[in-house]
From Swiss-Prot:
Alphabetical list of InterPro entries matching this protein: MeTrfase_TrmA_AS (IPR030390), MeTrfase_TrmA_CS (IPR030391), NA-bd_OB-fold (IPR012340), SAM-dependent_MTases_sf (IPR029063), TRAM_dom (IPR002792), U5_MeTrfase_fam (IPR010280)
Entry's family note: Belongs to the class I-like SAM-binding methyltransferase superfamily. RNA M5U methyltransferase family.
Keyword list, A-Z: Methyltransferase, S-adenosyl-L-methionine, Transferase
Annotated active site: C412
Coiled-coil intervals, chain numbering: none
Top-level division of the source organism's lineage: Bacteria
Name of the featured protein: Uncharacterized RNA methyltransferase EF_0728
Keyword check for Cytoplasm: no
PANTHER family attached to this UniProt entry: RNA M5U METHYLTRANSFERASE, TRNA (URACIL(54)-C(5))-METHYLTRANSFERASE
Protein's organism: Enterococcus faecalis (strain ATCC 700802 / V583)
GO molecular function terms attached to this record: rRNA (uridine-C5-)-methyltransferase activity
Positions that bind S-adenosyl-L-methionine: Q287, Y316, E337, D385
Length: 457
């Protein structure tokens, strides 16, 4: 038996001194950290110890003895249960400060770069109702088809109709589709024995166009009575221009399967970023917060500082949103993306906007960029927008060897950003400025844009 200062089921009084990067309150008992959900710095709480481990433990709030001035009423207790909005109890201004501090902390701790300016996080005027996409699981509860979200760390569905961080038109559409499925006794998916059929309802909506896409994700290709379901959806939701069925027969947590069937209308919806049109398919990666995407891309344009003469490489280009945004001010843009379907979308989006100075190639940036250089291309600006795992080590080496004048790094993970900045700094680059942008209010996710330039000897 380990001799910790607290043990499971102890009821103790603590004071919260900090927040973790996941938004949990931190208290210490004889230097032993306890992490507590729904707790804010400065609060005095009575808690119950839930679990103890070698380095830290977890607790649960029983009573708030002294509340933080930054605490605000929560929108919905179910939000806490499912973990969708772990910061909903923290005033929005304090959320922004928390995110700025997280970036500063990781830059100092991981990159050992205290002097890099981290600007205040750019927030939203209304930090709710921002998501343009919903992926809602479907299950049977009390013998009825239900939509909602899974309880944290479980596959128990909690029925929900209002998600608050999603476009309210999407919330309303989900409820209407749910009711249509109930009307026709569609069988919801049963994960335990891999029976039933309807697994998820996915809805995408163009922020500027209002166009809506409905994706019905099923276990089998047969969805009865589809001849009645489709007209009912169109009648209930006039904004729908695309209805798609996606078939996923596997026992997996992955939402989409490989087979997609068009049931009505177009395979894509259209939305705009600045004055550019983009076509979005069921599986396209497209930024989920359209308002903040424009804020973030404006910062990318500022850091790229294009004059019309530059060669730009857009690594991890997706469907071309960043590259095509920059093409208007560049000599030539080369987009690189590992997913072939996204490359085709990027090419189509270039045609849609009559942009002729952008080309897109399928492959790994760490393999294709050296080939471009071998063929005589010298990029002036490289934009990288990697997944959470950050840059591939080989790509970091390639960037250092290629020596573009500027690197603009769009990050969704401060820890891997700091790691990569440290490596690029060793390779002769200097991080000039980091601008966090709050694309995900009420959550702990942090996006940022960083400018790196060649260091001056």
């Amino acid at each position: 038996m380990k001799n910790y200062p607290v043990k499971k089921n102890d009821v103790i009084e603590v004071e919260i001194i900090d927040l973790t990067h996941e938004g949990l309150g931190v208290a210490k008992v004889d230097h032993y950290p306890l992490f507590i959900e729904n707790a804010l710095p400065g609060e005095k709480l009575e808690i119950k110890v839930l679990k103890t481990g070698k380095s830290f433990g977890y607790g649960k709030v029983l009573t708030v003895l002294k509340s933080s001035e930054q605490r605000v009423p929560v929108k919905d207790e179910n939000f806490t249960k499912v973990g969708i909005s772990p910061l909903q109890h923290l005033a929005y201004g304090a959320q922004l400060s928390f995110k700025t501090q997280q970036v500063e902390n990781v830059m100092q701790r991981v990159a050992k770069l205290q002097e890099v300016p981290v600007l205040p996080t750019i927030g939203m005027n209304d930090p709710w109702h921002y998501r343009n996409k919903a992926q809602i699981p479907v299950r049977k509860i009390d013998n009825q088809l239900q939509t909602g979200f899974f309880r944290k760390n479980s596959h128990d569905l909690i029925p929900m109709e209002h998600f608050y961080i999603q476009d309210p038109e999407i919330d309303a559409a989900i409820v209407k589709i749910r009711d249509i499925m109930r009307k026709y006794s569609v069988k919801p998916y049963n994960e335990s024995d891999n029976t039933g059929n309807l697994r998820h309802i996915v809805v995408r909506r163009g922020y500027h166009t209002g166009e809506m896409m409905v994706v019905l994700i099923t276990r089998t290709p047969k969805l009865f009575p589809i001849s009645k379901i489709v007209p009912d959806i169109l009648e209930a939701i006039p904004e729908v221009v695309s209805i798609v069925q996606n078939v996923n027969p596997k026992r997996t947590n992955v939402i989409f399967g490989d087979e997609t069937i068009l049931l009505h209308g177009s395979e894509k919806i259209t939305d705009t970023i600045f004055d550019l049109k983009f076509e979005i398919s069921a599986r396209s990666f497209y930024q989920v917060n359209p308002q903040q995407t424009e804020v973030m891309y404006q910062k990318v344009k500022e850091y790229a500082a294009l004059t019309g003469n530059e060669i730009v490489v857009d690594a991890y280009c997706g469907i071309g949103t960043i590259g095509l945004t920059l093409a208007q001010d560049a000599k030539q843009v080369y987009g690189i993306e590992v997913i072939e379907e996204a490359v085709k979308d990027a090419e189509n989006n270039a045609k849609l906007n009559n942009i002729e100075n952008a080309t897109f190639t399928a492959g790994l940036a760490e393999e294709l960029l050296p080939k471009l250089v071998e063929n005589g291309l010298q990029p002036d600006v490289v934009v990288v927008d990697p997944p959470r795992k950050g840059l591939d080590g080989q790509l970091v080496n390639t960037l250092i060897e290629t020596q573009p004048e500027r690197i603009v790094y769009v990050s969704c993970n401060p820890a891997t950003l700091a790691r990569d900045i440290a490596l690029l700094t060793e390779g002769g680059y200097e991080a000039k400025e980091i601008q966090p942008v709050d694309n995900f209010p009420q959550t702990t996710h942090i996006e940022s844009v960083t400018l790196l330039t060649k260091a001056v000897d």
